[in-house]
């Protein structure tokens, strides 16, 4: 799946990577590096604190917007080390986001809540979306899922 869009042979890829697992690990690391870069751009950019909160929590570079939600299940089955790396990446690198959340509470943009609980809710939601095939099978795009999640978490479900 990687060789064809790059117009190179599988043999060429395997001269650089000793296995498909090594290739996938590198791809995961690259994807999350891009996500962290995207978050840094959001934090450094203009916009209200509320806009930054919404954007940074669900940051997703354009090239990953079409992410297939069914991939995590396949990784768990075929490449558990890669699946573990994805989970580890989801759980790490939260410092800038946590600082933004703390700022939002301090400035009254967000009511005081347990930030570790909120972080766990976000991480668990993302992991659940990646593991459950039902949303992808019903045609829902991953970015739309993230946008709905953050809307519910930040705005709640009760009418205002």
Language model segments and positions:
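All-alpha amphipathic helical-bundle segments outside canonical DNA-binding/catalytic cores
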Residues: 50-51, 85-89, 105-123, 140-148
